[in-house]
């Protein structure tokens, strides 16, 4: 299978399943296509015991535990060897749960941290030694829509990570991508956009800002994750629409497309009217 075919097969497999929380999910079923050796799930989260890994007071959702051994069970069924664990917004700038998950997984794990201007350099150095290779800007969950604020946050993140060779990852939307397009295009570090760049399925490829994302991907100046497809949907009938977004991005540049399960699908719930 080509890279394009593998990406679409992975997405199609997700679209065939409803959304369930980690504690409601059945055992994973076996896949029906070949997975490349060394395959990587590029977007996952770990939620530890809240008594040991307390949540950020300003969080917008409260997830149930999702532990490294549960994720490993899924990855064995999917024949996935490597993983990227991303610090979710519910922990603020506390990356302890991510580091815990990376340590449990071992050398096949890498991490993406969340930091701010108060994060000391020695902490970044320590995370680098542990396998962190990027920082995430949670603009969407922080309610940041102002273009100037977004540009300032992006520039500050680039400055912090440049000497380490890390990347900057953004959880945002197409409007913000359009606002920072010039910065992303000239960035000295790799730029990654989460979850289809925050595009909405019902907006289609013509929605404002999506063309800017496509252009960044086509030019090789940014990566985009085909992850968290459920986030783009407001109804299950929109599944073909999110598939069209994926096809548009893959056609632009398959070498700048990343795939992730978004396990354990945080802030998700069964569709209204459907029982778990």
How would you label these PLM feature ranges?
Residues 72, 99-100, 178-181, 214, ...:
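Active-site phosphate/pyrophosphate- and oxyanion-stabilizing loops and adjacent acidic/basic residues
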